[in-house]
Design a protein with these regions (language model features):
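Domain-exit/linker segments immediately C-terminal to small folded modules
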Residues: 172-175
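Conserved structured core elements
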Residues: 7-14, 30, 34, 130, ...
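Generic hydrophobic alpha-helical scaffold/packing signal
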Residues: 18, 37, 137-140, 160, ...
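Short beta-strand-alpha-helix junction that forms the catalytic/metal-binding core
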Residues: 134, 146-169
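Short helix-capping/linker segments at secondary-structure and domain boundaries
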Residues: 22-31, 111-118
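Polyanionic (Asp/Glu-rich) segments that form extended negatively charged tracts
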Residues: 1-22
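Short secondary-structure subsegments characteristic of cysteine-rich extracellular domains
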Residues: 31-44
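Intrinsically disordered, low-complexity N-proximal targeting/linker segments that flank membranes
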Residues: 45-136, 144
Length: 175
C-alpha cells in the first residue's frame, strides 16, 4: 500500500521484490507476507543500498529465495539504525534520505487522512521528490517551536502528510 515510488528508500529495493514475484506467480501467503514486510523494513532502515548495492542485492536475492520457501532469512549482518525515539527526533527531514523515506512509507502505508475533510490524501510522485512538496507540512509550526525553545523544527517526526489543496489554499493562506 505504498502508493508512490518517490518515497521508496532505494530504487534497488524493487529488485528483490521483482525476483520474488517472478518466481511466485500468486500473492504471498502466511509467513511470506510477514517475511517480505520484515525484509522491506530491515533494508529500508539500515541504509542497506547506500553503498555496494550490487553485492548486497546478491545477498538479498538469497534472502528472497528463503522467503519463497516460507523460511525466515537471517539478518545478523543488517544493522537497523533505530535505537530510540530520540533517533527519530534528531533526524532532520530530507526527501533524499533513505531513512526519512522509510518513515514516509510508514506514514503512507497508514493511508493518511485529510485534516479538514477526513478524506484520503492523494500522494503524487511529482511533488514527493522535493522537501517543499505540497504534500509535506510541519505538524507544529516552525515559529511556534522556535518561540518555545523546542528542539529540532525540521525533525522527521514534525512532518505530516497533507493534501496539496489543504496546504496550498488553507495553511499557506494563514501563514
Amino acid at each position: 500500500r505504498i502508493p508512490v515510488s518517490a518515497i521508496l528508500p532505494y530504487d534497488a529495493l524493487l529488485v528483490p521484490f521483482i525476483y520474488f514475484f517472478y518466481y511466485q506467480k500468486e500473492n504471498p501467503k502466511g509467513t511470506q507476507i510477514k517475511y517480505l514486510e520484515e525484509f522491506f523494513w530491515r533494508a529500508s532502515l539500515s541504509f542497506r543500498y547506500s553503498s555496494a548495492a550490487e553485492s548486497k542485492l546478491a545477498q538479498d536475492i538469497k534472502r528472497i529465495e528463503k522467503i519463497l520457501n516460507s523460511e525466515r532469512p537471517n539478518y545478523d549482518d543488517v544493522k537497523v539504525y533505530l535505537n530510540s525515539p530520540q533517533d527519530l527526533i534528531d533526524t532532520n527531514f530530507s526527501t533524499g534520505n533513505s531513512y526519512c523515506k522509510a518513515v514516509l512509507c510508514l506514514l503512507a502505508y497508514q493511508e493518511p487522512k485529510d485534516f479538514q475533510t477526513n478524506g484520503k490524501i492523494i500522494l503524487d510522485n511529482s511533488w514527493l521528490k522535493v522537501a517543499n512538496s505540497r504534500n509535506y507540512h510541519h505538524f507544529f509550526p516552525k515559529a511556534y517551536l522556535r518561540k518555545n525553545n523546542i528542539g529540532n523544527e525540521h525533525s522527521l517526526v514534525n512532518i505530516s502528510l497533507v493534501s496539496a489543496d489543504l496546504n496550498k489554499r488553507k495553511i499557506r493562506a494563514q501563514a
